Amino acid sequence: MANLRTQKRLAASVVGVGKRKVWLDPNETSEIAQANSRNAIRKLVKNGTIVKKAVTVHSKSRTRAHAQSKREGRHSGYGKRKGTREARLPSQVVWIRRLRVLRRLLAKYRDAGKIDKHLYHVLYKESKGNAFKHKRALVEHIIQAKADAQREKALNEEAEARRLKNRAARDRRAQRVAEKRDALLKEDA
């Protein structure tokens, strides 16, 4: 058996793969041993005496299955954790995400006309001050604030109507009294 180490090295270089990916035909060892140049190796590659081996399959199915189960919440117990809670998900990042969600909601509501700019400003400051734990809490607060404003407006309108009614009654009474006085003065005269 001839030593074909050089031919294997040359073939790997010509084909453009590693030495372990080159197959030399064991029936043609004498012919391969004669090839001592890259050109000769190219000819052997062309006629199929030297062949580039296929890429070995490295399946990702197990990795995909593991990733899927991680998405479902598996493999995440205390035994699997290396970093601290803060290292795994910094509280700063959690805070930023939460605040961005709240601010986005406020801007959307303001642009849609669901809240006016004054209420927007108040709620913006409150959310910065950690008044709302999540989006639902903010939405509920907005609904409550709008209901309170509506109730207050209705009460104010009611009070204003009562004031106008009382003023009209006072005016009518004063007019009646003035008419009676005029009538009495006319009778006396």
Swiss-Prot record:
Residue stretches of biased makeup (Basic residues): 59-68
InterPro entries for this protein: 60S_ribosomal_eL19_sf (IPR035970), Ribosomal_eL19 (IPR039547), Ribosomal_eL19_CS (IPR023638), Ribosomal_eL19_dom (IPR000196), Ribosomal_eL19_dom1 (IPR015972), Ribosomal_eL19_euk (IPR033935)
Pfam families, A to Z: Ribosomal_L19e, Ribosomal_L19e_C
Cross-link (Glycyl lysine isopeptide (Lys-Gly) (interchain with G-Cter in ubiquitin)): 21, 53, 60, 146, 186
Broad class of where this protein is predominantly found: cytoplasm
Annotated positions of the Phosphoserine modification: 30, 37, 91
Listed SMART domains: Ribosomal_L19e
Quaternary context: Component of the large ribosomal subunit (LSU). Mature yeast ribosomes consist of a small (40S) and a large (60S) subunit. The 40S small subunit contains 1 molecule of ribosomal RNA (18S rRNA) and 33 different proteins (encoded by 57 genes). The large 60S subunit contains 3 rRNA molecules (25S, 5.8S and 5S rRNA) and 46 different proteins (encoded by 81 genes). eL19 lies in close proximity to the binding site for eukaryotic initiation factor eIF4G.
Other notes: Present with 97700 molecules/cell in log phase SD medium. There are 2 genes for eL19 in yeast.
Role summary: Component of the ribosome, a large ribonucleoprotein complex responsible for the synthesis of proteins in the cell. The small ribosomal subunit (SSU) binds messenger RNAs (mRNAs) and translates the encoded message by selecting cognate aminoacyl-transfer RNA (tRNA) molecules. The large subunit (LSU) contains the ribosomal catalytic site termed the peptidyl transferase center (PTC), which catalyzes the formation of peptide bonds, thereby polymerizing the amino acids delivered by tRNAs into a polypeptide chain.
Name assigned to this protein: Large ribosomal subunit protein eL19A
Organism: Saccharomyces cerevisiae (strain ATCC 204508 / S288c) (Baker's yeast)
